[in-house]
Amino acid sequence: MKKYSIAAIAAVVGVLTFGPPVEAAEKFQKLSGSQIRARLAGMEITDEAHWADVFAANGTLTSYSMGRKNSGKWHVQNDELCIDRGNDDGGCYQVWLSGKKIELRRAGSSLPLEGVLQKQSVRR
């Protein structure tokens, strides 16, 4: 009878139980100013449930959150997306993209705003 090491048995049991190892985190790429303009104009960023920010090509920002609609402005400055909602909820962000997934990262914050970049949805 062959002897198997405990580590080898544990590895096989782990793969059978949990599946193969997952690849490293998705590869996000930082967008330049021109890429931000090209990707966001006419599109929306949303969590697909509670909120959406619609980026019009003319720099108008329309936000929908929990049934409420608000307006603001957006522009690109120094390779960052800058949002002005008329309150303290604005600022400038680095934009990182991986497929349809998007992250807005603010300097000094470790928590990005995460969402999905998609064509504008029809809202009533």
Task: For the regions a language model picked out, list residue spans one by one.
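Structured alpha-helical
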Residues: 13
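Lipid interaction determinants
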Residues: 2-9, 18-124
